Regions:
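A short, N-terminal amphipathic alpha-helix
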Residues: 30-45, 58-60, 255-260
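A short, glycine/small-residue-rich beta-strand->loop->alpha-helix junction that serves as a flexible
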Residues: 16-27, 241-252, 272-273
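N-terminal nucleotide-binding beta1-loop-alpha1 segment
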Residues: 1-18, 236-239
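Short internal beta-strands
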Residues: 47-51, 262-269
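Short, charged/polar "capping" segments at the starts of alpha-helices
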Residues: 54-58, 269-275
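Active-site anion-handling motifs in enzyme catalytic cores
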Residues: 238, 267-273, 285-286
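Conserved core of the sugar-phosphate nucleotidyltransferase
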Residues: 103-193, 198-208, 221-228
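Short phosphate-binding loop-to-helix
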Residues: 53-118, 281-294
Length: 297
């Protein structure tokens, strides 16, 4: 029997930010960032649980990061997990989601060790998570057999869409523990998840702030970035791009932006093809990191 497995839940059909797992932060996809963080958590096997439509688009990323890719139901995520668990004999599941590139892997390791200790020395623990982490930096730990049992007992659409509630919304049947996170992880006011385009831009700023650090980033590094003025008060340059003015102002803004990791905003209404041609000359690596805010069509 496999002791632990990691399952990263991933879909590409988000209505607020479609295909967000495939968006780039630097030169890697959001999904790759998540998988590399979760690889720091010791486990017997590592899986991505996706839907059939997304499978072909993420399989290569999974392979590159030594994750097995499993396809199942799109809407019934609980069934997707159970179907995966029916293919592997394991005790403990560590669940993360593919829209959280700044996971606290240290907290994940501590929480799974606590979960396993409780199941050795106390009454059975079916589900455990640390509360108080930044929104987007935590994971869930649960018993594989308990989740299978829960799935067989609920028809609640919410339970089937979100997995964990099948356990913790039925505390009369399952022992679920929400442990207040240790002080070093306890920053509930911070946000690291990617749910909207604004979140995505913020994630880029976090990665830029930490560009001289080794990824996966430590919890201390992520917290420092999230609390920095660089991330919370980004500088957006708005160059004068009126037709006939030439490209001098835009060139100066580009120089400042590439030197200081500022953003540039050029509204779609600006009819300045010569300036857009200049933007096209920016080296691709700079463009990836700078993430110009430009509504060029």
């Amino acid at each position: 029997m496999e002791k632990r497995i990691v399952i990263v839940q991933c879909r590409l059909s988000s209505s607020r930010l479609p295909q967000k797992a495939l968006k780039k932060i630097g030169n890697q996809t959001v999904l790759a960032w998540v998988l590399q963080s979760m690889k720091k958590v010791p486990a017997s096997r590592y899986f991505v649980a996706t839907d059939f439509a997304s499978f072909g688009k993420i399989k290569d990323i999974c392979d590159e990061n030594e994750f097995e890719c499993f396809a199942g139901e799109l809407e019934d995520v609980l069934k997707r997990f159970v179907d995966l668990l029916n293919t592997v004999d394991c005790e403990t599941v560590i669940r993360a989601t593919a829209d959280n590139p700044f996971l606290f892997y240290e907290a994940a390791i501590e929480s799974v060790e606590l979960f396993e200790t409780k199941n050795k020395t106390e009454k059975n623990c079916d589900y455990l998570t640390f509360s108080g982490l930044p929104h987007g930096s935590g994971v869930e730990i649960f018993s594989a057999s308990s989740l299978k049992k829960a799935a067989s007992m609920t028809n609640d659409p919410y339970d089937h869409e979100h997995v964990g509630p099948a356990l913790y919304n039925h505390k009369d049947l399952f022992n679920c523990e929400f442990i207040n996170a240790p002080k070093k992880y306890n920053y509930p006011e911070l946000r690291t998840t990617i749910d909207t385009y604004s979140d995505y831009l913020r994630a880029i700023m976090i990665s830029l702030f930490l560009k001289n650090k080794n990824h996966p980033f430590s919890c201390e590094e992520i917290i420092d970035a999230c609390q920095s003025d660089f991330v919370n008060n980004p500088v957006i340059l708005y160059p004068s791009c009126k037709k006939g003015q030439g490209t001098g102002h835009l060139r100066r803004c580009l120089k400042l932006a590439t030197q200081n990791n500022y953003f540039i905003f050029i509204p779609k209404k600006e009819d300045v093809p010569e300036n857009f041609e200049l933007l096209d000359e920016i080296p691709s690596l700079i463009e990836e990191f700078l993430q110009l805010i430009c509504t060029k069509s």
